[in-house]
């Protein structure tokens, strides 16, 4: 008699997509430690080889959130600024700078993240370096959002079930669905998201998954130069999402050209930081209204896109203009001293 796991593996071996109930069973068994290492590795590689679908990724999100420490009780719209990583760039932590700038402008930000993946300084490293609290409980998150419009949710603290997955990921040593899953698992369930991907082919997969998991408004971004953020290096390819929170909505493809906003192109070296200390110093400069011009331009592009999502009716050119003014005024620095 076939077990559920053997049925799942046989389905993947034939190159077929998993039905929702099979996907849910597979991810539940994986996260509960009920698969052997051989089964877990076969499961993850089978998904990768055939190509993960939005429905399969959605079932992975649901299984992970069912086992997560959830954060509730934050009223009104909230946003997360996050990327999949894997762009191979040691760029400054633009997502954290964007999040803090938005918080300084009065928007509620619940940033979910971890240590560095492809940069010199990951979101958690940056938050820690700026002196902001890292090890938070749900009550702390609610209090900090009320106090300063910003809280950081350190992923390992909120996803204990991932301890069953990490050894398998390390042994495999290759990209799996879990490289995409992290940005989708914010336990505070923000209504808005600015999500970056390092590969353009991931745009529809991630956008459709956000829609299915209940996000109301989002932009999934692939930046010029292969970055998982908008950059001054050239036009960004973007999928805009308008959802009803119940899995239904529309997706629209757009392109955003920095030249339209008076931004000069730059090189990857002008966006890079060599180490954590430099990364934190640059962040402080940017949040105070200074910093290197190419990094400031990149920050403006991402803040502007997020404002376009958060403020209904705010056209993108007006959002970019508002972002420029906020950066010049050092809006993000207010959060550090709240």
Curated annotation (Swiss-Prot):
HAMAP family: TrpD (MF_00211)
Source organism superkingdom: Bacteria
Keyword Transferase in record: yes
Native organism: Nitratidesulfovibrio vulgaris (strain DSM 19637 / Miyazaki F)
Protein known as: Anthranilate phosphoribosyltransferase
Record GO cellular component, one term: cytosol
The reaction(s) this protein catalyses: N-(5-phospho-beta-D-ribosyl)anthranilate + diphosphate = 5-phospho-alpha-D-ribose 1-diphosphate + anthranilate
Binding partners and assembly: Homodimer.
Single GO term (MF): anthranilate phosphoribosyltransferase activity
């Amino acid at each position: 008699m076939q077990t559920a796991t053997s049925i799942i593996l046989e389905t993947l071996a034939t190159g077929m997509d998993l039905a929702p109930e099979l996907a849910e069973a597979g991810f539940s068994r994986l996260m509960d430690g009920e698969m052997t290492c051989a089964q877990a590795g076969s499961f993850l590689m089978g998904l990768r080889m055939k190509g993960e679908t939005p429905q399969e990724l959605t079932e992975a999100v649901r299984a992970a959130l069912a086992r997560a420490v959830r954060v509730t009780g934050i009223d009104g719209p909230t946003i997360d600024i996050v990327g999949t990583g894997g762009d191979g760039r040691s760029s400054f932590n633009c997502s954290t700078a964007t999040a803090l700038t938005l918080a300084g402008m009065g928007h509620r930000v619940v940033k979910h993240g971890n240590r560095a993946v492809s940069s010199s300084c990951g979101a958690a490293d940056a938050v820690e370096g700026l002196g902001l609290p890292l090890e938070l409980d749900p009550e702390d998150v609610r209090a900090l959002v009320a106090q300063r419009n910003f809280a950081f949710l350190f992923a390992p603290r909120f996803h204990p079930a991932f301890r069953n997955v990490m050894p398998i990921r390390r042994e495999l040593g290759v990209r799996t669905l879990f490289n995409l899953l992290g940005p989708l698992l914010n336990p505070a369930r923000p209504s808005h998201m600015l999500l970056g991907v390092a590969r353009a082919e991931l745009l529809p997969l991630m956008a459709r998954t956000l829609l299915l998991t209940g996000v109301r408004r989002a932009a999934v971004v692939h930046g010029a130069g292969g970055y998982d953020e908008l950059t001054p290096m050239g036009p960004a390819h973007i999928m805009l999402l308008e959802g009803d929170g119940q899995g239904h909505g529309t997706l629209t493809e757009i392109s955003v050209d920095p030249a339209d906003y008076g931004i000069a192109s730059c090189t990857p070296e002008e966006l890079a930081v060599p180490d954590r200390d430099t990364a934190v110093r640059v962040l402080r400069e940017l949040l105070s209204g200074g910093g290197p011009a190419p990094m400031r331009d990149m920050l403006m592009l991402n803040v502007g896109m997020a404002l376009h999502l958060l403020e209904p009716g705010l056209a993108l050119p007006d959002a970019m203009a508002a972002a420029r003014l906020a950066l010049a005024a050092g809006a993000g620095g207010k959060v550090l001293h709240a």
